[in-house]
């Protein structure tokens, strides 16, 4: 990984909720989606059901020179909607297991600094894009 970006949703009250992270290689090609723990990103916890609604019609708004980046990220969110939802369900299952093993509440698990990353899912670029063009049911 050369770098990564975090995608947030801004609530009506201005509070940020983390949707997902995207790791990038040195050329800027996507490597993996990831779901960090809440203490890593701060803000409000985004439930999987809410994330599912947001991923049905992602709407990233950037103006000026970053408008193209917003379009690219929006297309990636659409392309990877199903894998992202699967990753978030796996995140929730990992939190449940951690709570059971450690005797924690979900709120305590989300602030447990021993856990930085709950789940990730790989991106196989450009193979995934070709599969989407060819109609693979894995994508939108």
Over which residues does each language-model region extend?
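Aromatic- and glycine-enriched beta-alpha-beta binding-site module
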Residues: 1-40
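Mixed-charge (acidic/basic) macromolecular-recognition segments
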Residues: 29-123, 127
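Generic signature of intrinsically disordered, low-complexity segments enriched in small/polar residues
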Residues: 7-11, 83, 128
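Charge-rich, low-complexity intrinsically disordered segments
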Residues: 125-140
């Amino acid at each position: 990984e050369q770098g990564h970006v975090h995608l947030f949703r801004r609530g009506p009250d201005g509070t940020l909720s983390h949707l997902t992270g995207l790791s990038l290689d040195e050329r800027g090609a996507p490597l993996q989606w990831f779901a960090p723990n809440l203490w890593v990103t701060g803000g409000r916890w985004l439930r999987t059901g809410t994330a599912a609604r947001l991923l049905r019609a992602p709407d990233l708004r950037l103006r000026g020179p970053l408008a193209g980046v917003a379009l690219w990220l929006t297309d990636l969110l659409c392309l990877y909607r199903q894998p992202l939802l699967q990753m978030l369900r796996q995140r929730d299952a990992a939190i449940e297991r951690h709570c059971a093993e450690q005797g924690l509440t979900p709120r305590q698990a989300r602030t447990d600094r021993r856990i930085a990353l709950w789940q990730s899912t790989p991106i196989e670029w450009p193979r995934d894009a070709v599969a989407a063009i060819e109609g693979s049911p894995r994508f939108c």
